């Protein structure tokens, strides 16, 4: 394992020298912090082409890659092993994934936060491994925020951990079937006060009533042209419509 720059000694009065540093094959497994320390010791780019694995936090690893060829060369195809247990922004993991053609092993992570789109990017990447049992917080919130139920269901299928949507999510969209799947999933925790916009043209009244029971928000059914089901279920649906500003 690369041991920082403990073997390097300043030979002049300045802290940074024009030293040529080449990481030997015996140090193929390096920590991100030690690589950063190395290129901070010299004005000449460090040759790290022998490195096959970098270990460290996502932030530390991204610092190494962000240094660029003027500071460190030979990187771009190594395996990265993360040490984080929690990631407050999944975007940083996606950035790391883009920095190397090697695999990013994120098995250390047990909780992760980010927008639904960025989370789906991470979980859909062939370059990121080790995910699948962590707690997820979906951060989309505020006026204009909207999530597709099908996307939530897709993310739900990729982890055995609990997924929680943020307070203040404005709208959930999708088919009644997809929406009911999302609300009914044990792996998804949805606030339940968001507005709903359905995309179906034909819906079974019982399914629509089930959806209405999941949320205190308004259900927009403007696309609906046909409602099927028993007379009792249809009457319940229209009664709910009359009691709210929903459009059926």
Residue ranges and their predicted role:
Residues 1-248:
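General marker for long, soluble alpha-helical cores
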């Amino acid at each position: 394992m690369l041991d920082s720059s403990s073997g390097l000694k300043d030979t002049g009065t300045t802290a940074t020298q024009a030293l040529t540093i080449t990481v030997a094959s015996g140090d193929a497994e390096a920590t991100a912090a030690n690589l950063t320390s190395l290129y901070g010791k010299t004005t000449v780019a460090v040759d790290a082409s022998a490195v096959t694995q970098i270990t460290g936090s996502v932030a530390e690893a991204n610092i190494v890659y962000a240094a660029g060829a003027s500071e460190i060369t030979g990187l771009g195809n190594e395996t990265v092993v993360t040490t984080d247990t929690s990631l407050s922004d999944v975007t940083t993991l996606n950035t790391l994934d883009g920095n190397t053609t090697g695999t990013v092993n994120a098995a250390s992570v047990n909780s992760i936060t980010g927008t639904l789109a960025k989370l789906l990017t991470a979980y859909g990447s062939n370059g990121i491994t080790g995910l699948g049992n962590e707690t997820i917080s979906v951060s989309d919130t505020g006026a204009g925020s909207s999530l597709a139920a099908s996307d939530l269901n897709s993310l739900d299928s990729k982890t055995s951990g609990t997924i929680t949507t943020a307070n203040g999510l404005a709208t959930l969209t999708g088919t009644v079937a997809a929406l009911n799947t999302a609300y009914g999933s044990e792996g998804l925790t949805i606030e339940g006060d968001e507005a709903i916009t359905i995309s179906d043209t034909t819906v079974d009244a019982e399914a629509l009533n089930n959806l209405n029971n999941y949320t205190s928000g308004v259900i927009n059914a403007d696309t609906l042209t046909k409602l099927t089901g028993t007379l009792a279920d249809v009457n319940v649906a229209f009664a709910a419509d009359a009691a709210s500003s929903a459009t059926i």
